Amino acid sequence: QGIPYENIEPFNAAIEAAGYVTGGTGGKVRPVVCCKGTVCVHGLVDTRKLSQEIHEKFYIGWHEVRLPHKFKIGIGGCPNNCIKPQLNDFGIFGQKVPKYDPDDCNGCKKCSVIDVCPMNACSIDDDGIMQIDKSLCNNCGKCTSACNFDCIEVEKEGYAVTLGGIWGKTQRIGTRVPGVFTHDELLSIIEKCILLYREQGKTGERFGRSVDRIGVENFIQQLLSDDVLDRKQEILDAQLHLTGGAKC
């Protein structure tokens, strides 16, 4: 029925010796959650490797950094988003952007690309040429290996990012940050995001509510610049969010 106060430190030492740690709650970066990534037939990125890297860099490395509230990171291997990255404070999912020139299309009577597109983003125009509606495309990459004449190539592979997802008593779907980001860009964005949240969030305020209060466009503009990195040490050293915040 609980651990007596005087046994807390011995308990921590005992489970640390077994390879476990305590302290996964409170106003801080939480343990990272991911899907199985490339083990799945739909997976575009190695989510487990990325999850481990983010875990070590931000959950362990920034474990003592106090934030206004919990900060959950979710990683999906593709746009199917089985673990619902958009409902996490910081969401990540794999992207494979198609590169296609309609002039390369042979006008096959039976288009193999249309058959595999889950978003109905591909269609045949009046001239019998396949077209891709970019407004419908979610960059799942299925089409890039579907054309029998290799008319569709991969323009870019990387990660999509969403900000400020909340689920529970109140809900907020994460806001998509424009662009597809490389591995290094992604890690930099996570770092800048945490710094901005620590600096500009109010104690007890969920990240998504901070983004809305600051202004989505304003926050994303700050996020995509490197100005906050010039204030990194100042932000980390500041006496912020010492009491209150997340209760679980």
Question: Over which residues does each language-model region extend?
Answer:
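Small-residue-enriched alpha-helical segments and adjacent helix-cap loops
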Residues: 1-110, 116, 135-136
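A hydrophobic, small-residue-rich beta->alpha segment in the mid-to-C-terminal subdomain
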Residues: 167-202
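Long C-terminal interaction/binding lobes of large macromolecular proteins
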Residues: 221-248
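Flexible, glycine/charged-enriched surface loops at secondary-structure junctions
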Residues: 22-27, 64-70, 199-213, 229-237
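Generic secondary-structure signature for well-ordered alpha-helical cores
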Residues: 16, 20, 59-63, 119-122, ...
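Short beta-strand elements
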Residues: 89-94, 159-168
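Iron-sulfur cluster-binding cysteine motifs and their immediate structural context
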Residues: 110-132, 142-158
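Terminal amphipathic helices with adjacent charged low-complexity linkers/tails
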Residues: 4-11, 18, 214-227
